[in-house]
């Protein structure tokens, strides 16, 4: 099997590089930059999704996008980071956090960026209108919602080494990105901070940051201005 990963720098596709590094798989990495106009680096997916994988097997090429779908498919082929060897409560934790990340946590986080981008792209003379809407939505709903997310996660990590329990799984790979995006605004949650340091010490994670050309400062600035 040949694997070609189309990756957008400093995006959620960083998690797939990390995943492939954890599995020790060989892959070709094609990186797209936000300022890059080279169409050769575009995702082959019809919706130009990142991450996207081209999987070449027995002279046939298939396209697979969506982070969770990629993790699930390769966890089926390489089950060591999936539900293998998890006991009942650990299995429940695994499925809950894996699905909670993409279905509940990230949508609230993305709303921060959507409202910020709307305000930034509105003509200057009327920009105060979307900024007021953003402020009202933040104060009335979004900030409280994210606070509840982080509080719940911190309490879980107080009792567990990883999201499933004692075993590192793909749930941890998924949860890393939104936690990092929120962490600079919620530094009071010490168990989340411990967890992020724990991730940063993994050799596969360090390799993935280098290969994905991850910029911590760019990432922090991107999310800080959305608050």
Residue ranges and their predicted role:
Residues 20, 204-205:
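Short beta-strand edge/turn micro-motifs at domain boundaries
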Residues 33-36, 171, 213-214:
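Conserved beta-strand edge residues that scaffold enzyme active sites
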Residues 69, 191, 204:
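Residue-level recognition of oxygen-bearing side chains
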Residues 101-201:
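GST-like fold's C-terminal all-alpha helical module
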Residues 200, 206-209:
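Extended hydrophobic/aromatic segments used for targeting, binding, or gating
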Residues 208-227:
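Terminal-tail/helix-coil boundary detector
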């Amino acid at each position: 099997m040949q694997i070609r990963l189309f990756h957008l720098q400093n995006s959620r596709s960083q998690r797939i590089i990390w995943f492939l590094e954890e599995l020790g798989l060989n892959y070709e990495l094609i990186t797209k930059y936000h300022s890059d106009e080279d169409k050769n680096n575009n995702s082959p997916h019809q919706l130009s999704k990142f991450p996207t994988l081209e999987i070449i097997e027995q002279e046939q090429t298939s396209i697979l996008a969506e982070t969770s779908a990629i993790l699930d498919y390769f966890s089926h082929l390489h089950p060591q980071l999936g539900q293998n060897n998890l006991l009942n409560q650990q299995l429940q934790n695994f499925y809950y956090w894996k699905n909670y990340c993409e279905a509940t946590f990230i949508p609230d986080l993305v709303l921060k960026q959507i409202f910020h981008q709307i305000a930034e792209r509105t003509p200057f003379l009327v920009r105060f209108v979307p900024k007021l809407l953003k402020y009202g939505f933040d104060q009335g709903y979004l900030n409280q919602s994210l606070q509840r997310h982080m509080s719940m996660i911190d309490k879980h990590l107080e009792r567990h080494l990883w999201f499933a329990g004692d075993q590192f799984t793909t749930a941890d790979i998924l949860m890393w990105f939104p936690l990092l995006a929120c962490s600079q605004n919620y530094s009071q949650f010490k168990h989340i901070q411990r967890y992020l340091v724990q991730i940063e010490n993994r050799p596969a994670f360090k390799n993935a940051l280098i290969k994905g050309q991850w910029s911590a400062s760019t990432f922090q600035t991107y999310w800080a201005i959305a608050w």
